Amino acid sequence: MYGYTIRSENHSTQFTGRWPTWVRDSHVSVQLGASLEGCLSEPIIMGVGYRWFGRPLLRFQDSEKAHGRSLSMLRLASSNPITRLALRVLYKPRVSLPVELFGYRYNHPFGLAAGMDKNAKALRGWEATGLSFVEIGGVTMLEQGGNPKPRMFRAPHAQALVNRMGFNNDGSEKIQLALERHINRHGRLGIPIWVNLGKSKITPLDEAHLDYGATLERLWSYGDVFVINVSSPNTPNLRELQDDEGLTRILRHCLNVNDKLASKLDSERKPILIKVAPDMTKEQLVHIAKTAKTNGADGIVVSNTTVERPKTQHPKDATVFGQQGGMSGQPLKERSTFMIRTVRQAVGMDWPIIGVGGIANAQDAWEKLEAGATLVQAYSGFVFEGPSLTKQVVHGLSKRLRASQHASIADVIGTKSD
């Protein structure tokens, strides 16, 4: 038993040890015990609860508004020690599958992909739900509102999202202040913060390297890992920066900024990765990966959203797939896994690959690890499975690891990349 009950009616408490006055007087009613941890926190039960009740309610709302409200609820829940504890009890995995990467020890290989929390609004919430790392952004140098609304759509039968957000975010200056406030109030987050760097829409392509570099410089002290996003389909001509000249110029400039800041602040340089699109040939993918590695990138994120669409017999999904923008979710799974395997074959085992695209359960994550991913991320999976996805994936990976002949998750990486 956790041994405490807090009720608002008479401010009475039953607990072991001393609680601060503000907790005793709080207007909440929380009962935590072994029954909660042993029953309600089981990932399958919590996942079913979300699918039966949470997801149907969100279905009646505009996709972007539902996203914003869910993020606000997570932020609110993580702002109070009691509700933050409840998040940990309900959603945090109870197993450890450690992975060492970039000088950090990740509790397991599962993290949050960029796009879910663009402006770093719910960092403590993501940590409380058990993710091993969180990627904020895309962050652009300048604040921008993105494309006209509506711009986010759900295809429920295919478990896919289509968006044309257009790098809407608060901009690097405001996000720097938000991260600084977070550190001043709460200290550094207990898990690594990754920062996805995007190009400001008004910045010409031939000045993109300066735009990325300025955002990197502004957020350098607050992020642990940085991802250069040259693959969003929702910023005009952005994917042209994946060619040799554009990618090389951006990487060299950002690496130069990285080295200068590390020297100036007497610190270690920060890992810098690139994120690529799925809409290219195998030969193009291999060329981009080798170009990035040759020019000093510390790894690659595979992959961003796709402009391709699957066939469907469901009218609502067909309407969504008719929308312009990038698609994520289950239909991207096989393509993403194929790309991971392709890159792993091309670059060998010593270059980190972050796998993202269509992860909705432990089997999806396991397949990406086998294909060669060092870590994996999800975005759409959280929309359709809810916050219990982390526990589902991590516990499922643990079960598969025990049933395999591998001693650790690190031993799984790339075992089926041939």
Residue positions per predicted region:
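Glycine-rich beta-strand-to-loop/alpha-helix junction loops that act as flexible
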Residues: 113-114, 275-277, 353-359, 379-380
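Active-site entrance/lid segments in N-terminal catalytic domains of soluble metabolic enzymes
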Residues: 98, 102, 111-295, 309-312, ...
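Glycine-rich phosphate-binding active-site loops on the catalytic face of alpha/beta enzymes
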Residues: 135-144, 230-232, 299-307, 365-392
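Extracellular/periplasm-exposed beta-strand and loop segments of Gram-negative cell-envelope proteins
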Residues: 4-27
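One-face residue pattern on beta-strands with alternating periodicity enriched for small/polar residues
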Residues: 1-3, 25-39
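Alpha/beta catalytic cores of nucleotide-metabolism and tRNA/nucleoside-modifying enzymes
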Residues: 41-90, 150-153, 157-173, 177, ...
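Long amphipathic N-terminal alpha/beta scaffold segment
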Residues: 85, 89-108
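Glycine/Thr-rich beta-alpha phosphate-binding loop at enzyme active sites
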Residues: 84-93, 233-246, 291-349
